[in-house]
């Protein structure tokens, strides 16, 4: 969470540098600092993402350019693969922004662009895969049931924000390393 002055601030946070430990991967470090996979890999192009050497200096890109959009509610920057949430502010209180990395649609499953609203929220959701997703999984030898119940194997994770766009939602994941990649349906 960052406080900022909407009249003059377009950037929040600051870059950090840490030292990699023996068992670290860039994916592990990204999750620890609320970053996506591509964010941390792009900030450390000379570092092996799966085997950084112990003692290697790792740049933590926790400085964020705020989107050029109305700063209210949820704003998603697809190019940055990042969600920005601008909560309502009480009079006299500083404006805040909360930001999280996210995965976006694969190239063949383009993420839509435009204005929508959150139609509903659910904790521990079931997932009803679309026929095309079930067909794709069956073709790959991984058939899906008609309904995936809540739990650790549910691709929706533990929370879902259903959007007014049919079949689109902002949701958790059962595969945290996919955060910050083009891997979603």
Regions from the language model: what does each represent?
Residues 23, 53-58:
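Loop/turn positions that initiate beta-strands
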């Amino acid at each position: 969470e960052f406080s900022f002055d909407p009249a003059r601030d377009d950037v929040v946070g600051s870059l950090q540098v840490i030292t990699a430990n023996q068992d670290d991967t860039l994916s592990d470090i990204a999750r620890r600092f609320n970053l996506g996979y591509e964010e941390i890999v792009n900030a450390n192009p000379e570092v092996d993402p799966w085997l950084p050497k112990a003692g290697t200096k790792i740049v933590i890109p926790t400085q964020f350019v705020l989107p050029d959009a109305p700063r209210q509610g949820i704003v998603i920057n697809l190019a940055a693969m990042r969600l920005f949430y601008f909560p309502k502010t009480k009079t006299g209180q500083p404006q805040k922004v909360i930001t999280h990395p996210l995965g976006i649609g694969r190239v063949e499953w383009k993420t839509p662009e435009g204005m929508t609203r959150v139609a509903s929220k659910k904790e521990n959701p079931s997932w009803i895969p679309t026929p095309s997703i079930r067909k794709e999984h069956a073709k790959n030898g991984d058939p899906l049931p008609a309904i995936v119940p809540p739990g650790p194997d549910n691709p929706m994770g533990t929370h879902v924000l259903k959007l007014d766009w049919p079949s689109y939602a902002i949701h958790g994941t059962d595969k945290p390393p996919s955060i910050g990649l083009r891997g979603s349906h």
